[in-house]
Swiss-Prot record:
The gene is CAMKV. The modification Phosphothreonine is found at T435, T459. The protein kinase domain is predicted to be catalytically inactive. Residues 387-428, 438-451 have a biased composition (Polar residues). This is CaM kinase-like vesicle-associated protein. It comes from Homo sapiens (Human). Residues 331-365 have a biased composition (Low complexity). The lineage of its organism: Eukaryota, Metazoa, Chordata, Craniata, Vertebrata.
Length: 501
């Protein structure tokens, strides 16, 4: 039985916790993310090492949805540049997802260790990402969280391939998507502007990745006071909406025109005019000889160390400020005027957020060239203009990530991404105005992801992690269905039923 997974339906057959420990040795936790703990696991039969992601069902609906989503998507895909699913076990209390183990380094670390780094090296990285994304897009899958942190080398060999990880935000594109999701510095204009979007958001993110790899700088940044996070983020989103970036000197002086052309086409503001992943693979900078061999390591590394190795900002402060601004668009200016005092009581800071959101869409950003967005700061996208949005509220997390909600709200995560929340703080009216929610809607009903992450970090882990032995024993898992697409659809349907409940 290659996969210890459940058959979806009214009657569920769960794996027994002992099935996991009978087959795998789970070491100590090597990383804690928003939704799961990550272990290095050893197959007792083959001795092969894998990565294990353990999701606790008791941690909430968003955690269960993320696990089901990742399982469903990974069962659909098989590509050399995507970490492959090895095994799945679902007990009554946990999800265990076993993946290939990537032992190489992140792309940033690889660049810093090189003696020679040129456009050709960047072209090789971008080509592999484009090939993986073109494959995903052929299946109508949108990754939605492409960023440098999710690109790693498969091993430490000289010619190691690049692999893409982290699929808990990936989504089947059944019609255009509307929930905001991703990592702020990589968000496409249509996501920041709360428009419906699809596969082109991944191509925009690849353009941002390419820009950083060629210059060491993020394309959108502002020079602000060290603690002025609100202005930084307000201007960041305004610049993204306008596509306001430059190939500034001296960082781009030695970069070929072909490279600049591909970046420009990937970062086209209008999503219907943006180059596709398949088209980008055929671009001369990827498939031809247009990429330069000139060594650009010194300039790129200097900027990487300046922009991304510095202190990673005070995330909690930055996210809290941004969340206040994000809550404000949910109420129209008319509704806010009619119930200002009630709004101030129920959602502190919302009024200040409204002012920031209005400024975000109405004023131009000052130019700057020193301050850069931190490598792993993750915050929620701002509204495109002063026009209020009608989707849900946002709750800040302590590490600066954001997650899309089923109703369009954004809740910060802990791994630099954006995932769906479940409650609403404003109800849209038929005339486009938003009606403030009652007081109880502002009270969280479940423990926040930030609190759970803090608990996980503070609680010492045993030498060997075991599945919950108190979980009720059930029948053994069923073999996977013959159709991966049907199984993935099953996970998606179950997730939707859970949200509806």
């Amino acid at each position: 039985m290659p996969f210890g997974c459940v058959t979806l339906g009214d009657k569920k057959n769960y794996n027994q916790p002992s099935e996991v420990t009978d087959r795998y040795d789970l070491g100590q936790v090597i990383k804690t993310e928003e939704f799961c703990e990550i272990f290095r696991a050893k197959d007792k039969t083959t001795g092969k090492l894998h990565t294990c992601k353990k999701f606790q069902k008791r941690d909430g609906r968003k955690v269960r949805k993320a696990a089901k989503n990742e399982i469903g998507i990974l069962k659909m895909v098989k590509h050399p540049n995507i970490l492959q699913l090895v095994d799945v076990f679902v007990t009554r209390k946990e999800y265990f997802i076993f993946l290939e183990l990537a032992t190489g380094r992140e792309v940033f670390d690889w660049i810093l260790d090189q003696g020679y780094y040129s456009e050709r090296d960047t072209s090789n990285v971008v080509r592999q990402v484009l090939e993986a994304v073109a494959y995903l897009h052929s299946l109508k899958i949108v990754h939605r969280n492409l960023k440098l942190e999710n690109l790693v080398y498969y091993n430490r060999l000289k010619n190691s391939k690049i692999v893409i990880s982290d699929f808990h935000l990936a989504k089947l594109e059944n019609g255009l998507i509307k929930e905001p999701c991703g990592t702020p510095e990589y968000l496409a204009p249509e996501v920041v502007g709360r428009q419906r979007y699809g596969r082109p958001v991944d191509c925009w993110a690849i353009g941002v990745i390419m820009y950083i790899l060629l210059s060491g700088n993020p394309p959108f940044y502002e020079e602000v006071e060290e603690d002025d996070y609100e202005n930084h983020d307000k201007n960041l989103f305004r610049k993204i909406l306008a596509g306001d970036y430059e190939f500034d000197s001296p960082y781009w002086d030695d970069i070929s025109q072909a490279a600049k052309d591909l970046v420009t086409r990937l970062m086209e503001v209008e999503q219907d005019q943006r180059i596709t992943a398949e088209e980008a693979i055929s671009h001369e900078w990827i498939s031809g000889n247009a990429a330069s061999d000139k060594n650009i390591k010194d300039g790129v590394c200097a900027q990487i160390e300046k922009n991304f190795a510095r202190a990673k900002w005070k995330k909690a402060v930055r996210v809290t400020t941004l969340m206040k601004r994000l809550r404000a668009p949910e109420q129209s200016s008319t509704a806010a005027a009619q119930s200002a005092s009630a709004t101030d009581t129920a959602t502190p800071g919302a009024a200040g957020g409204a002012t920031a959101a209005a400024a975000s869409g109405a004023t131009s950003a000052p130019e700057g060239d020193a301050a850069r967005a931190a490598k792993s700061d993750n915050v929620a996208p701002a509204d495109r203009s002063a026009t209020p949005a009608t989707d849900g509220s946002a709750t800040p997390a302590t590490d600066g990530s954001v997650t899309p909600a089923t109703d369009g709200s954004i809740t910060p995560a802990t791994d630099g991404s954006v995932t769906p929340a479940t409650d609403r703080s404003a109800t849209p009216a038929t005339d486009g105005r938003a009606t403030p929610a009652t007081e109880e809607s502002t009270v969280p009903t479940t423990q926040s992801s930030a609190m759970l992450a803090t608990k996980a970090a503070a609680t010492p882990e045993p030498a060997m992690a075991q599945p919950d032995s108190t979980a009720p024993e059930g029948a053994t898992g069923q073999a996977p269905p013959s159709s991966k697409g049907e199984e993935a659809a099953g996970y998606a349907q179950e997730s939707q039923r859970e949200e509806a409940s």
